Amino acid sequence: MHGENRVQTEYFLYPKLGAGQMWQEVAEKIKKRGGIIELGAMVDSLVLDNNMLKKISYIKSNGKRVFEEADVVISTMPLSSLFANMTGNVPISLRTIADGLKYRDCVIMGLCIKWPELANGAFSMENFPERMIYVQDPKIKLARIQVYNNWSPYLVKKKNELWLGLEFFCKEGDDFWNLSEDECAKIAVSELKKIGFIESGREVVCYHR
């Protein structure tokens, strides 16, 4: 993990309380400008007119379908789903390309480990600056480790605890996807030991999938 080919961004902007804080701010600005945020709604149709998306329909959490005119549509859904839900004169070539796209699903396991060295400064940004560590071992399911302490110290309440975000690539509905939280945590801890990230004596405080 501490080889010569380390890639580490020296400077970047990151919300004090995590990425979710940015979207909370966005939501507040939308509301202040008179916008309405529909939670639990599912877009089921996008109407293409003269190569422009002008109308969408979505189903609210109560089951009611709503149609909305739009000047601008910003989509964050996978392109395959976006084109599958489009109606109107959509070029066949674009539908074909979108249908052929493959996506990976991801399970993120939050793991808190008691790490007394953090409190006395032995383990710090100076000697361990990594925020993300990519694991490239074909025998290991774990793909990436996020060290939340190094993203922002305000994300961690206790100075003697190390919070990790462990990312596992899988496919929705497969064996790994269907693991229980306890089973997933057991694999996460086992693989951290295999790659030498933690020793056997480390205490796991809690975990959350």
Predicted features and spans:
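Helical element adjacent to the flavin cofactor pocket in flavoenzyme catalytic cores
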Residues: H2-V72
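Short, hydrophobic/amphipathic alpha-helical packing segments
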Residues: A19-W23, A185, V189, R209
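Mid-domain catalytic core of redox enzymes
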Residues: A41-S200
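A glycine-rich dinucleotide-binding beta-alpha-beta segment and adjacent secondary-structure elements
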Residues: I198-R209
